[in-house]
Amino acid sequence: LADKVGLLSGGQRQALTLLMATLQKPDLLLLDEPTAALDPSTASKVLGLIRTIVGEQGLTTFMVTHNMADALSMGNRLIMMWEGRIIYDVRGAEKDALSVEDLLRKFEEVSGSALDNDRMLLG
């Protein structure tokens, strides 16, 4: 507790921020790129912490991510946006059956464009 926040690692800061944001059990938890700029190991730990806290507290959570594997593995609904509009909205068993490749195909089908940014394809 005596450590200065500025001296914490990125993952430690993300974890601390998540804990602070959920102390009062918010009506809606907004997570904007919660694993951005984190190495894969730390990102996995942060996602695990998110799953635990959200699950234990039963929080309604809206997570923004460009990582399609994370989008598929987290939550019960996936909304894909492009150029400011919703192009795909899926939930439940249909979402659970999807792969990153399925999402890429759906994006290309609906948008008419192919994704070429490796960051979006991580998984």
Specify the residue positions occupied by each region the protein language model found:
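Short loop immediately C-terminal to the Walker-B catalytic DE motif
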Residues: 35-36
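H-loop/switch region of ABC-family ATPase nucleotide-binding domains
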Residues: 65-66
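Helical segment within the ABC ATPase nucleotide-binding domain
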Residues: 44-57
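Conserved catalytic motifs of ABC-family nucleotide-binding domains
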Residues: 25
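Conserved beta-strand-loop-alpha-helix hinge in the C-terminal portion
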Residues: 85-111
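Helix N-cap at the start of a conserved alpha-helix in ABC-type nucleotide-binding domains
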Residues: 40-42
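Catalytic Walker B motif of ABC-type/P-loop ATPase nucleotide-binding domains
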Residues: 29-32
